[in-house]
Structure formats: C-alpha cells, structure tokens
C-alpha cells in the first residue's frame, strides 16, 4: 500500500535500488548524490562477457561497490530468503530501473511507498525490454520516459510522471539511450520529491493503447530491401549500435550505419547499389533510395564507405542480399 505522503517532508528516505545496465547507472548516481539514503543495491548476477567469457559485474554493481553499499545478486527473486534480506533494510521506497526481473507482490508491497520504476518509453507504448530501440525503429516523432508505481505485470503499473522529448532527425538507439537516461534521472528525482510531498497522483494506464517492445536478437537486424527507404532508415538507426542492421555482400555479412533517405528515382531492383562514392552507398529499395555512409564488413571495424572503397571494389552491378 502506497502512502500519499510520508510523515515529514524533511525525512530522508531509506531506498533500495534495483537495476543492472548503464541505463540505470545515472539514476543510482543521482540518488547517491541526493538527500535520501540508498541502503542496498540489487542487481543481476555477474555474467560471462567478451571473447574470453570473463565474469563481468553489471555497471550498477560497480557503482554500488565504489560507494561501499551492500549488493544483492539473487538468482531467484521469488524466495522467502530474498524477501527477508530486503526487509532487513527497512526500506521506505524501492526504486527499480532496468533490473530485468518481474517482481512478486510481496516485494512490491514491502516498502510503505511501494516500488517505483523508471521506464524508457511513454507508457503504455513499448512495454518490455527494448523500448528505446523500438521507438527509433518505428520512427516515432516524440519519445520519453515514464515513472510508474509497479504492479505484478510487465510495465503495466499506474503512471506517476511522464517526460517527453523530440528525437533529432539522425537519432540512433545509442544517442537516444543517453538522452533518455538523463531524462529518466530527472523524472525519478521529481517523482520521489512528489511522493514525499504528496503532490503526485497515480493514473491508470490505458491498456487498450499498449504496445510491446520485446528484446531484440541479432537476426532482427536483417534488411529486407523491398521495404521503403524510410522504414529501412529507421530500422538501421534503431539497431545502432546493437544488434546492428545488416545484409550480405558476396556472402559475407555487412553491417550498415548512418543512413539517409534519397528520393532519386530508379527502376533498379531493391538492394542494387546505384552508386558507390565518397558520400556513401546509394542503394535501391522498395520505395525511394537509401544512402548509407558507414559500414562494417565482416571481421573488420566500422568505417566510412570512403575508407572501405580504398581497399575494395563495389560497382553499379552489385546487389546487396539477404543471405
């Protein structure tokens, strides 16, 4: 049960923070710099990473250990032992940002002010693990973050606060990630202040308007050249930097970056390279053309098309394929 206002506006809240990736890091840093007390941090277990599969700590854990905070990394969240461990910290509030697990009701009800979540979309749009990427892929003309009172569903809780920004014309998932991380921190601090003062009122989501943003896989980046140039531009930007959009050149994977729609008319088949020059690859699509300025050949680093052409030949008869 969420209290509309704590006993005193001046009280320093005891906060448990739950999060894992870089997107959550700025929120934790802001809480550590603020008037409230982060009493513990919960994050995902360390995972093997890189070619050497070295066990690597989540970004949030690194920050927590630098601050001397206790860190919990449960493999399961639906256990009495984990609930008791959280309860021992007597939290007033639990803050969750990209933790990566759905929390059970006993945890949601543990703190007097409940659990609040910072989500990287304008809910109810893009519920799920990859809201930022999907917003770019879909070509949204406004994006933002939402703080919500968590319930047992996947991003279905009541909305506390929304903040909106307009993406730039050349926005990628990577650049938008950075902007929304900063915006999310601002929204979180404003939400906590509003909960303290009792000035924020929760509003139910319109579930009929909900859309999903499932986790992306590498294969989601495969380019279908029969789609329009506008759709492909959004796809390539939404897949940058990961998992990246790709096609095949002479049987080898070619990742594409920095696209721009061109309205040059052509009767060439989709995927045909119309021009390869210093400004990029001009490629025919299902509607209009696409100018791609940077690429990453298989086994090599990302580079400009101009740099690629210094050591490779690609002409007007080249066709980029899906296999």
UniProtKB/Swiss-Prot annotation:
CDD domains attached to this UniProt entry: FMT_core_Met-tRNA-FMT_N, Met_tRNA_FMT_C
Catalytic activity of the protein: L-methionyl-tRNA(fMet) + (6R)-10-formyltetrahydrofolate = N-formyl-L-methionyl-tRNA(fMet) + (6S)-5,6,7,8-tetrahydrofolate + H(+)
The family this protein is said to belong to: Belongs to the Fmt family.
Alphabetized SUPFAM superfamilies for the sequence: FMT C-terminal domain-like, Formyltransferase
Binding site for (6S)-5,6,7,8-tetrahydrofolate: 121-124
Keyword Protein biosynthesis attached: yes
Keyword tags: Protein biosynthesis, Transferase
Described function: Attaches a formyl group to the free amino group of methionyl-tRNA(fMet). The formyl group appears to play a dual role in the initiator identity of N-formylmethionyl-tRNA by promoting its recognition by IF2 and preventing the misappropriation of this tRNA by the elongation apparatus.
Class in the EC hierarchy, top level: transferase
Organism per entry: Desulfotalea psychrophila (strain LSv54 / DSM 12343)
Cellular component terms per the entry's GO annotation: cytosol
UniProt-recorded name of the protein: Methionyl-tRNA formyltransferase
Listed EC numbers: 2.1.2.9
Molecular function per GO: methionyl-tRNA formyltransferase activity
């Amino acid at each position: 049960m969420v209290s509309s206002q704590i006993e005193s506006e001046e009280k320093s809240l005891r906060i448990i923070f739950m999060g894992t990736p870089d997107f959550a890091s700025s929120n934790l840093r802001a809480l550590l710099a603020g008037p409230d007390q982060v009493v513990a941090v919960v994050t995902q277990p360390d995972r093997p990473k890189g070619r050497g599969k070295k066990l690597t700590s989540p970004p949030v854990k690194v920050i927590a250990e630098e601050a001397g905070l206790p860190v919990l990394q449960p493999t399961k969240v639906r256990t009495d032992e984990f609930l008791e461990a959280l309860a021992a910290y007597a939290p007033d509030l639990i803050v969750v940002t990209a933790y990566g697990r759905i929390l059970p009701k006993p945890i949601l009800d543990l703190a007097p002010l409940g659990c609040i979540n910072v989500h990287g979309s304008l809910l109810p749009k893009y519920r799920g693990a990859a809201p930022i990427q999907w917003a770019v892929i879909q070509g949204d003309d406004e994006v933002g973050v939402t703080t919500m009172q968590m319930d047992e569903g996947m991003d279905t809780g009541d909305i506390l606060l929304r903040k909106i920004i307009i993406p730039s014309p050349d926005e990628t998932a990577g650049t938008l990630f950075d902007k929304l991380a900063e915006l999310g921190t601002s929204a979180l601090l404003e939400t906590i202040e509003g909960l303290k003062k009792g000035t924020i009122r929760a509003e139910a989501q319109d579930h009929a308007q909900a859309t999903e943003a499932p986790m992306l896989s590498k294969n989601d980046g495969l380019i279908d050249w029969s789609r329009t140039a506008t759709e492909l531009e959004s796809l390539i930007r939404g897949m940058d930097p990961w998992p990246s959009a790709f096609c095949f050149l002479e049987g080898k994977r070619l990742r594409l970056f920095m696209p721009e729609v061109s309205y040059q008319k052509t009767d060439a088949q989709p995927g045909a390279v119309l021009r390869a020059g210093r400004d990029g690859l001009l490629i025919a699509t299902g509607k209009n053309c696409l100018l791609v300025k940077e690429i990453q050949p298989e086994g090599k680093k990302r580079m400009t098309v101009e740099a690629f052409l210094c050591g490779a030949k690609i002409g007007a008869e080249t066709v980029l394929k899906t296999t």
